[in-house]
Every structure is written in structure tokens, then in C-alpha cells.
């Protein structure tokens, strides 16, 4: 459960991301594909090369979904219901992949926002991404 401090930390950190949301989303995807090659199996139709327009476009989708989640931090199930359906019923993404992407997002944010990425902010973002992952995998049960 996200505390009021966690919510404030997440919102403040996401404000710092600002217009870089697509760029950071794409970078996190690239990190995931390089660090966890099995995740590539969900993107057989993508050009996964560095700087690929398809990875950039999907990174923007990921970033925009997280921006939506931050904006609806008190109702993540409502905000992410359609995405949960998509990933559970159509794409059938293995739930572990959300944890892998979350880790890569944390690394990406830490590398771009080092002075803002305090231990407290890190913990809050980790809890937030875990909450998002839980919602996205809730329809699997």
C-alpha cells in the first residue's frame, strides 16, 4: 500500500521525468531486452536494435501508461483496467516480465535523475511500480 509520502515522492519524481517519458520508457525497454533476452519473445515483429522506431514508440506507450497511473495513483485498478485486460487476455505476457521492466525503469530513472533518486524516492517508486505490476497481473488469477 502506498503511503501519502510514497504518493508525493512518486508524483515529484514523475514531474522531473516530464517530457522525457517516451525516451526513458524506450531506454528501459532496451535495458530489459539486453539484460533479460527472453523478454524479446513478446516482440518478434519488432526491430529491437538500439534506437529502433518501434522500441521508441512502445517506450512512449509504457511511459504514457505510467503517467496515467501516476495521475490516478489512488485508483490504479480503474486507470489500468484496459491494459490489464490486454496483457492478460490478448498478449498473455508472463507476469514476471513486469518485474523485470520495473527494475529496468528504476535503473533508467536513477541514471537520469541521480540527485533526485534518494533512497526514499527509490523505495516509493519501487512500491509504485510493484503496485502497477500487481494491477496489470490481477486478471491472470
Curated annotation (Swiss-Prot):
The modification N6-acetyllysine is found at residue 16. O2 binds at residue 58. One of its GO terms (cellular component) is blood microparticle. Red blood cells. Residues 1-141 form the Globin domain. Keywords: Acetylation, Heme, Iron, Metal-binding, Oxygen transport, Phosphoprotein, Transport. Heme b binds at residue 87. SUPFAM superfamilies: Globin-like. GO terms for biological process: hydrogen peroxide catabolic process. The modification Phosphotyrosine is found at residue 24. It comes from the Eukaryota. The modification N6-succinyllysine is found at residues 7, 11, 16, 40. GO terms for molecular function: haptoglobin binding; heme binding; iron ion binding; organic acid binding; oxygen binding; oxygen carrier activity; peroxidase activity. The modification Phosphothreonine is found at residues 108, 134, 137. The modification Phosphoserine is found at residues 3, 35, 102, 124, 131, 138. Involved in oxygen transport from the lung to the various peripheral tissues. Belongs to the globin family. Heterotetramer of two alpha chains and two beta chains. This is Hemoglobin subunit alpha. The lineage of its organism: Eukaryota, Metazoa, Chordata, Craniata, Vertebrata.
Amino acid at each position: 500500500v502506498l503511503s501519502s509520502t510514497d504518493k508525493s515522492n512518486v508524483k515529484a519524481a514523475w514531474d522531473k521525468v516530464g517530457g522525457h517519458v517516451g525516451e526513458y520508457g524506450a531506454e528501459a525497454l532496451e535495458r530489459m531486452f539486453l539484460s533479460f533476452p527472453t523478454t524479446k519473445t513478446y516482440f518478434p515483429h519488432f526491430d529491437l536494435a538500439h534506437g529502433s522506431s518501434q522500441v521508441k514508440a512502445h517506450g512512449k506507450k509504457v511511459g504514457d501508461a505510467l503517467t496515467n497511473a501516476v495521475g490516478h495513483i489512488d485508483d490504479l485498478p480503474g486507470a489500468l483496467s484496459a491494459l490489464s485486460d490486454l496483457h492478460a487476455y490478448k498478449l498473455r505476457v508472463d507476469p514476471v516480465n513486469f518485474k523485470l521492466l520495473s527494475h529496468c525503469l528504476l535503473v533508467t530513472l536513477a541514471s537520469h535523475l541521480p540527485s533526485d533518486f534518494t533512497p526514499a524516492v527509490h523505495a516509493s517508486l519501487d512500491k509504485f511500480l510493484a503496485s502497477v505490476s500487481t494491477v496489470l497481473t490481477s486478471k491472470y488469477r
